[in-house]
A protein has these predicted regions:
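Nucleotide-activated sugar donor-binding and catalytic core shared by glycosyltransferases
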Residues: 1-238, 248-386
């Protein structure tokens, strides 16, 4: 079992479990390792190498110190394992604080920290899409309420937290950590030879990512979206490179749905390759929550791309405020119209305005300072330890 070095520094346990958490936390993890006695624990929620391992390599991250192997036979068992194994880990290593990001099931690990009176710091706090059907929306509410210090990306998110009655004095706006990660990797992104390897011509393909539970697991939504994708292939008559998660691939296979021949299913791509493809796509069509942040960043560095989000809601309204992407829904008419508009706006020199909270490149430093500042405050004011 891994343990802290006990070198006199604050002992911080960071818990991750999915690709988005690893990507967004990359700069924060490395910064925390500089200034804290830090352990990185992985729940195993995403266990495929291309969904996980390749990103540690791309982002120059040391491997996790602890693998919990929490995946069970079904969702209930997995969620139970995440909570139970995280609790046991905290009992054994005795961290001074726990840091999580986002809204995944892995974030539910903080339930154990709360019962153990360990200060909890939550990044990406306050995000709300106002769609109660989404499991992430439930997780957001749970983790925001449990956390002792919430670190939001934007004033929209801070306002949502305040509206739920959470203490304003323990809520901060740090901005999104994505710009720092993208900036640190921009040279490698621009140098990627992924187009040569895949035989794609820049500007002559559509990049597709569709993996969200509401789009893949719900029959009506699945058929609506993938029929729309086939129509998109017919209309634009160019390759559609589908960065396809194992779950999505299995769903397509099990359903017997026949994709248009121009839709190329590809295993999930590495961080540098995927972002190079985004920068040079005719259009990016994705249900990823990171799309608005990536679109904003690449606009800020002079590489705007047409971005279409295949969802009916967004937890990043600040990106719509600045016109960084188009929200299309999952029907054929909405998707085709949205691609037309997104592509035409970029062609006409109207890429939108970078979101100020999405282009801040010192988020990791802010997080270090907030954690160091508030562990003692939480112990005194919340848990009355001294």
């Amino acid at each position: 079992m891994a343990s802290f070095k006990n070198n006199g520094k604050l002992k911080l346990l960071i818990i991750v479990g999915t690709r988005p958490e690893i990507i967004r936390l990359a700069a924060v993890i490395n910064k925390c390792r500089e200034y804290f006695d830090c352990l990185l624990a992985h729940t195993g929620q995403n266990y495929d190498y291309n969904l996980n391992g390749v990103f540690f390599k791309d982002l120059k991250l040391a491997d996790p110190d602890v693998y919990m192997e929490a995946v069970g036979n079904d969702l209930g068992e997995t969620m139970g394992n995440i909570i139970a194994k995280s609790y046991q880990l905290m009992v054994e290593v005795k961290p001074d604080a726990v840091l999580v990001l986002g809204d995944t099931n892995s974030c539910l690990s903080v339930i154990g920290a709360k019962r153990l009176h360990i200060p909890i710091f939550h990044m990406e706090a306050g995000n709300r899409c106002k769609d109660e059907c989404l499991p992430e929306e439930t997780n957001r509410r749970i983790v925001d309420i449990i956390s002792d210090v919430n670190m939001a990306y934007s004033e929209h998110a801070r306002r949502y937290l305040a509206d739920t009655g959470l203490p304003k004095e323990r809520t901060y706006v740090t901005g999104s950590p994505m710009a720092e990660v993208l900036h640190n990797n921009l040279a490698e992104i621009e140098a990627s030879d992924i187009h040569k390897r895949l035989g794609l011509e820049k500007g002559k393909y559509i990049l597709l990512s569709a993996h969200r539970e509401e789009n893949i697991d719900t029959e009506k939504n699945f058929l609506s979206l993938f029929n729309a994708i086939n129509k998109m292939a017919e209309k634009y008559d160019m390759p559609i490179l589908y960065s396809c998660h194992p779950r999505s691939r299995k769903r397509i296979q099990d359903s017997g749905f026949k994709l248009d021949a121009r839709v190329i299913q590809h295993e999930p791509l590495g961080f540098h390759d995927y972002n190079c493809l985004q920068m040079n796509a005719f259009c990016v069509v994705s249900d990823s929550g990171t799309l608005p942040e990536e679109s904003s960043f690449f606009t800020s560095v002079g590489h705007p791309f047409p971005a279409v989000c295949i969802r009916t809601s967004t937890e990043r309204p600040e990106a719509l405020d600045k016109g960084c992407f188009v929200l299309s829904g999952i029907d054929t008419v909405g998707l085709l119209q949205s691609v037309d508009v997104a592509v035409s706006l970029i062609r006409d020199g109207l890429p939108g305005i970078p979101v100020p909270d999405y282009v801040d490149e010192n988020v990791s430093t802010k997080v270090v300072r907030i954690i160091q500042s508030y562990v003692g405050v939480v112990n005194k004011m919340v848990w009355r330890k001294f």
